[in-house]
C-alpha cells in the first residue's frame, strides 16, 4: 500500500552551526569542527569528523579540551547572528521550492514541509531536488525525511543521516513495508 496523500517531509540541516562556520572557512571542509555554547561552556554542535573522534554533544568544553587539542579540532564560539541569517536563507529556499504555505519552521535548523501537492510525483526525486537546491543556493547541507506523518518523517530523516552515503541524505517511507522495517 502506497501513501500518496498527506505526505510530510522534514528538512534538517546537517551539523548546522558547524556547517555555518565552514561556509566561510572552506579549508575546514572534512576537518573536525565544534561550536560552543554561550560563554564557551558546552559543545552544542559537532561535525561528523568530531563525532568520529568521540567528542560528546552537550559535554562540558573543559572535559573535551584534551581530545580537541590532541586532534586539532577547530573550535568556535557560537555566532547566533550568522546562524539566524543562514537559517532564514534555508527557510526562504524551502518556501520558494514548495510554497510559503507549505513550510512550517520547526527550529533554527529544521522545517516540516507539506508535500500534498507533490503526491503524484516521485518523492525520492523531490527530496533529492530539495537537498541539492538548498545546498546550491545556501551552501548548507541538509537531510530530508519523507513519510505520512511528522513523527515518521523524523524517523526517516534519522535514517537518512545514519547512512548519508547510501541514502544521499534522503529517505522516503511511503509504504507500509518500508515503515515496518
What spans do the regions from the language model cover?
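Gly/Gly-Pro- and Ser/Thr-rich, intrinsically disordered tail segments characteristic of DNA damage-repair
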Residues: 2-181
Amino acid at each position: 500500500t502506497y501513501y500518496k496523500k498527506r505526505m510530510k517531509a522534514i528538512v534538517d540541516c546537517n551539523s548546522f552551526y558547524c556547517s555555518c562556520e565552514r561556509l566561510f572557512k572552506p579549508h575546514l571542509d572534512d576537518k573536525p569542527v565544534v561550536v560552543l555554547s554561550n560563554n564557551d561552556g558546552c559543545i552544542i554542535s559537532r561535525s561528523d569528523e568530531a563525532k568520529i573522534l568521540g567528542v560528546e554533544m552537550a559535554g562540558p568544553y573543559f572535559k573535551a579540551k584534551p581530545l580537541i587539542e590532541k586532534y586539532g579540532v577547530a573550535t568556535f564560539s557560537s555566532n547566533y547572528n550568522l546562524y539566524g541569517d543562514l537559517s532564514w536563507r534555508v527557510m526562504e529556499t524551502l518556501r520558494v521550492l514548495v510554497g510559503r504555505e507549505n513550510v512550517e519552521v520547526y527550529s533554527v535548523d529544521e522545517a516540516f514541509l507539506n508535500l500534498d501537492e507533490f503526491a503524484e510525483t516521485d518523492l525520492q526525486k523531490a527530496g533529492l531536488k530539495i537537498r541539492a537546491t538548498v545546498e546550491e543556493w545556501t551552501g548548507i547541507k541538509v537531510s530530508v525525511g519523507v513519510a505520512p506523518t511528522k513523527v515518521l518523517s523524523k524517523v526517516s530523516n534519522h535514517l537518512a543521516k545514519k547512512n548519508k552515503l547510501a541514502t544521499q541524505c534522503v529517505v522516503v517511507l511511503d509504504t507500509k513495508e518500508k515503515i515496518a522495517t
